[in-house]
Amino acid sequence: APREAITQPFLETTREDFQVALDISTYSFVALTRAAAPLMVRRGGGSLLTLTYLGSERVFPNYNVMGVAKAALEASVRYLSSELGPQQIRVNAISAGPIKTLAASGISGFSDILSVYRAHAPLRRNIDAGEVADAALFLLSNAGRAVTGEVLFVDAGYHAMGLGEIRNDDQ
């Protein structure tokens, strides 16, 4: 989605920006699946994987319309898995925590995001791209043959936390 559609209040999202976000983040995966499914059927099955983000379930500052688009993507994963399962085609998503990359360095306040994740994740650390790749290998390989319609969180447990640790600062 255009940068202003992410940073402006959600209520100010235009129809065009909404459509762009859904087209790029959701429909593109459906279109890719439509193209790949016949090839996978001929091979006796396969596995499709997409990336999503916790902003699909929770409100994150400066994510706005992308959160709605990712929620639609996750629903699409479930519907596609139901439709394609009988042909032995698995459809899943990975919801990764923030990863320190060159692209991420351009995100305002990204070091603060990393700090919050590290402080509140049960594993008390951030993740790296290799850990996301390992999860993808599992889901795409025969090791994940019984997994479909799922969103696998690779975020050091951050998604599982409610308020996080409550500290008594009065003492």
Language-model segment annotations:
Residues 121-132:
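A conserved structural motif in NAD(P)-dependent oxidoreductases
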Residues 2-3, 9, 15-17, 21, ...:
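Catalytic loop of short-chain dehydrogenase/reductase
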Residues 33-34, 78:
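A short, exposed helix-loop element centered on a Lys and neighboring polar residues
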Residues 85, 90, 147-149:
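Short, small/polar-rich loop/turn modules that mediate ligand/substrate recognition or access, typified
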Residues 137, 148-171:
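Short C-terminal tail/terminal secondary-structure segment
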Residues 38, 82-83, 145:
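Alpha-helical segment proximal to the catalytic Tyr-Lys
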Residues 86, 96-121, 161-171:
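A glycine/serine/threonine-rich, flexible loop-to-helix segment
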